[in-house]
């Protein structure tokens, strides 16, 4: 793939700025990405990027859960008829612990240098996954970090107001985790006798209707 001279120039300059840290970088599909090895360096590295390469805007923070990465919901058998693949056989869904299950991703924009980069870091597995908040660097981080906490259960140290932002305050679990059931845990309805909304355990069976199949 041909990389533009300007993009390559930005990549080399930023790589030089981050040379003292455990960071790996690449240019892929016309985008610059840097991977941080140690999550304890996230705040310092992002602060350095903002100050020394004028990344004055944080456009997004998100995360990825790799718990079931590379696993199929169904195991597809060999072709046994003219109609195509044999019937899918449902298999036990494995949710065994994986190393560095979660990855956090930051999208940065420098309007002064007209360049965007992606900075990501695999997070160490722990009962409480904790990352330093960057809301002191970019006010825009406040709500997107709350969203990551709400959806993935990743906590942000020194965040000014780490509360759920998309789900109810009494919500159980984190919906974008791979081990969160698609049906959820509770459902709500309006109870005419009580005159209010009530929560009840879901009565829907959690099953795979459109399976993810990986054919190698």
Swiss-Prot record:
NDH-1 is composed of 14 different subunits. Subunits NuoB, C, D, E, F, and G constitute the peripheral sector of the complex. PANTHER family: NADH DEHYDROGENASE [UBIQUINONE] IRON-SULFUR PROTEIN 3, MITOCHONDRIAL, NADH DEHYDROGENASE UBIQUINONE IRON-SULFUR PROTEIN 3. It is an enzyme of class 7 (translocase). The gene is nuoC. NCBIfam families: NuoC_fam (TIGR01961), PRK06074.1-1 (NF004730). The keyword Transmembrane does not apply. This is NADH-quinone oxidoreductase subunit C. HAMAP family: NDH1_NuoC. It is a peripheral membrane protein. Belongs to the complex I 30 kDa subunit family. NDH-1 shuttles electrons from NADH, via FMN and iron-sulfur (Fe-S) centers, to quinones in the respiratory chain. The immediate electron acceptor for the enzyme in this species is believed to be ubiquinone. Couples the redox reaction to proton translocation (for every two electrons transferred, four hydrogen ions are translocated across the cytoplasmic membrane), and thus conserves the redox energy in a proton gradient. InterPro entries: NADH_DH_suC (IPR010218), NADH_quin_OxRdtase_su_C/D-like (IPR037232), NADH_UbQ_OxRdtase_30kDa_su (IPR001268), NADH_UbQ_OxRdtase_CS (IPR020396). GO terms for molecular function: NADH dehydrogenase (ubiquinone) activity; NADH:ubiquinone reductase (non-electrogenic) activity; quinone binding. The lineage of its organism: Bacteria, Pseudomonadati, Pseudomonadota, Gammaproteobacteria, Thiotrichales. It catalyses: a quinone + NADH + 5 H(+)(in) = a quinol + NAD(+) + 4 H(+)(out). It comes from Francisella tularensis subsp. holarctica (strain FTNF002-00 / FTA). Keywords: Cell inner membrane, Cell membrane, Membrane, NAD, Quinone, Translocase, Transport, Ubiquinone.
């Amino acid at each position: 793939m041909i990389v533009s001279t300007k993009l390559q120039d930005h990549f080399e300059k930023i790589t030089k700025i981050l040379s003292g840290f455990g960071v790996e970088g690449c240019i892929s599909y016309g985008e610059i990405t840097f991977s941080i090895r140690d999550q304890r360096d996230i705040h310092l590295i992002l602060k350095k990027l903002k100050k020394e390469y004028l990344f004055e805007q944080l456009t997004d923070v998100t995360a990825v859960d790799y718990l079931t990465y590379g696993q199929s919901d169904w195991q597809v058998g060999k072709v046994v008829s003219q109609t195509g693949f044999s019937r899918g056989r449902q298999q036990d869904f494995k949710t065994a612990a994986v190393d560095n299950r979660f990855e956090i991703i930051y999208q940065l924009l420098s309007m002064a240098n007209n360049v965007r980069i992606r900075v990501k870091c695999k997070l160490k597995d722990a009962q409480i996954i904790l990352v330093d908040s960057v809301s002191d660097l970019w006010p825009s981080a406040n709500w997107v970090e709350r969203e990551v906490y709400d959806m993935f259960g990743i906590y942000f140290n020194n965040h000014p107001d780490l509360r759920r932002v998309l789900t109810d305050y009494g919500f159980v679990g984190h919906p974008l985790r791979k081990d969160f059931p698609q049906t959820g845990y509770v459902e709500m309805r309006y109870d005419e006798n009580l005159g209010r909304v009530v929560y009840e355990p879901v009565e829907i069976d959690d099953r795979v209707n459109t399976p993810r199949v990986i054919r190698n």
